[in-house]
């Protein structure tokens, strides 16, 4: 049986192609995650939104 955590990718909203990978508990957080994190390609903090790992 599979675990309760899904691997996800946090994709930069600055359209630089930069992303972070993490996992989330799909039972406790059913919605899409959104974080403000550092994007080294534009050298500033931007919003990262959840996307699937292909």
From Swiss-Prot:
Similarity-based family: Belongs to the bacterial ribosomal protein bL33 family.
GO MF terms, alphabetically ordered: structural constituent of ribosome
Annotated Gene Ontology cellular component terms: cytosolic large ribosomal subunit
Cross-referenced HAMAP family: Ribosomal_bL33
Superkingdom of the organism of origin: Bacteria
Classification lineage: Bacteria, Pseudomonadati, Pseudomonadota, Gammaproteobacteria, Lysobacterales
Keywords linked to the UniProt accession: Ribonucleoprotein, Ribosomal protein
GO BP annotations, alphabetical order: translation
Entries under SUPFAM superfamilies matching the protein: Zn-binding ribosomal proteins (SSF57829)
The protein's name: Large ribosomal subunit protein bL33
Species of provenance: Xylella fastidiosa (strain Temecula1 / ATCC 700964)
InterPro entries (UniProt xref): Ribosomal_bL33, Ribosomal_bL33_CS, Ribosomal_bL33_sf, Ribosomal_zn-bd
NCBIfam families given in the database record: PRK00595.1 (NF001860), rpmG_bact (TIGR01023)
Cross-referenced PANTHER family: 54S RIBOSOMAL PROTEIN L39, MITOCHONDRIAL, LARGE RIBOSOMAL SUBUNIT PROTEIN BL33M
């Amino acid at each position: 049986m599979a675990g309760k955590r899904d691997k996800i990718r946090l994709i930069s909203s600055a359209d630089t192609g930069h992303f972070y990978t993490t996992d989330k508990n799909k039972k406790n957080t059913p919605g899409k995650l959104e974080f403000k994190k550092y994007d080294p390609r534009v050298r500033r903090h931007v919003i990262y939104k959840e996307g699937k790992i292909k």
